[in-house]
């Protein structure tokens, strides 16, 4: 099978060498076998014209303007109204044609009409049309109008031209707070890299004695949130209190968002608790912030409180936030209630992100049938819903179906976008399908998806899992704008190829760079410390985790316990376990494994019994750890009992590893008949799945 046809992505080369396949195309041959003429015609020498130059035609109105110019009247006020209608419809081409007509006739245009046109330019992100409107404002002598000047600043920044916005702003003789706010807002919208520009503009604003309002500070808080500038955020918080602006719910919402994005959950909660009259925007910011900081259960509790106590029902923004949270914690029952609310409201059913969120929820909860039902029940499927389905297949281990979905998606007429490609690449990694992975890489290059940090990160992981370590290094070296995920992926690449010390070196280089490790990076490096038995480095990481307040994240606390256990420091492992405020299956499994690593098998079994007696629900990983300990210690009766407990009490489907651990132990202990019976069960269950 050819590479091109394997995924259904057409016109793709078979290897990573895209330059040849995209730029070099052989010319067609004619019937006699002679090469066809080159598509690029040779330049001909242009002879000087001897004929006299033609006189330009006189200007005629019908040549410049279409005959069907949609004017209802020659009255200027009615024409202005028509332009505003076209602006609201984002039909800038027709609106600007009418403006040209008015200019030719010498009919002036008012500021309200220009304001509507500039707003349309912002909605369409059309810098070209915005500059044309700016020219007409100058022609009409309205450039000194402060209202329009503020609108122009906002238009230029929203369309990505901060330089032009600054130029318009500097030309103003008496800039008021509104034009300053427009400049601040536009600089914030233009991205994280403009944080210093926002800070310098804000400082200049204060030095000139401009009266700050809540919108000024809100824009500054948004900039600090994007750059995680906590120190500056705290100073601005104090300034807001000093200026008596902190009673605004709008400003407090921005502050909550900033503290969450800086990782300060406690400060965000304190600000939230101070708000007396909370609207849906504040609740949404709080739920999104908790979800962003991996506090899924807290986000879920707040979501319940919002509905049951405050009687505030979720909008599409909160639904888009809470659906992934429900999937992460496997809250299928509550997820179905939310789905019922979505169906009842009828406003959110066909919204792309809500629809894909429902698919993602069911798939994460292991209910693929319901996920597929939601997907195929929609009349307006798109690339977003297809990507959600692919992600669901991958999450449930159906990697072949996930890879085939990219073909089915194209058969329905949808082209894979950046998110789709980033979803499919991990599937190629799991299947070790380097051929399809290279094809997707070529597709990304051809469609100009690269350089995209998330996509490059996925490519790095795919190549490393496929056993090609030189490609991830090359991709990482060429990446100009690295982020924390790219550094973490590079660490994973070395770990995947069993070069653990190189992974630690990459981590050290990351610390020397401007990027600071997040909870995921810390978890990865803790695993490396466990495998290397590097207790000293593990303790240093533990200190860094405490400083950053990552220890409350379940998987991080579990990795700390496991690291101490594998390094033989059981005392620190127990201390770390006791320090976890809200324990779960991850932390209990980690302490069980810590006892097992130190050959304290009976203590590990007692720990498992204690976990069950306290009402905690063991998962498949917990049973893997317990059965492995029983196998090492030769506890055959306990292993058989735990295996039955897994099946009958917790309704967990045993994996091949669970079966093999118990079967091997039974054979070792001479209980051959029971082992054979279990082997038959194993084969029948594998046939059913």
From Swiss-Prot:
Keywords: Chloroplast, Plastid, Repeat, Transit peptide. It is found in: Plastid, Chloroplast. InterPro entries: Pentatricopeptide_rpt, PPR_At4g14850-like_plant, TPR-like_helical_dom_sf. The keyword Transit peptide applies. This is Pentatricopeptide repeat-containing protein At1g71460, chloroplastic. Residues 38-52 have a biased composition (Low complexity). The lineage of its organism: Eukaryota, Viridiplantae, Streptophyta, Embryophyta, Tracheophyta. Belongs to the PPR family. PCMP-A subfamily. Residues 1-49 form a transit peptide. It comes from Arabidopsis thaliana (Mouse-ear cress). GO terms for molecular function: mRNA binding. GO terms for biological process: RNA modification. Residues 16-68 are annotated as: Disordered. It comes from the Eukaryota. Gene3D superfamilies: Tetratricopeptide repeat domain. PPR repeats lie at residues 75-109, 110-144, 145-175, 176-212, 213-247, 248-282, 283-309, 315-350, 351-381, 382-416, 417-451, 452-482, 483-517, 518-552, 553-583, 584-618, 619-649, 655-689. PROSITE patterns: PPR. Its main location: plastid. One of its GO terms (cellular component) is chloroplast.
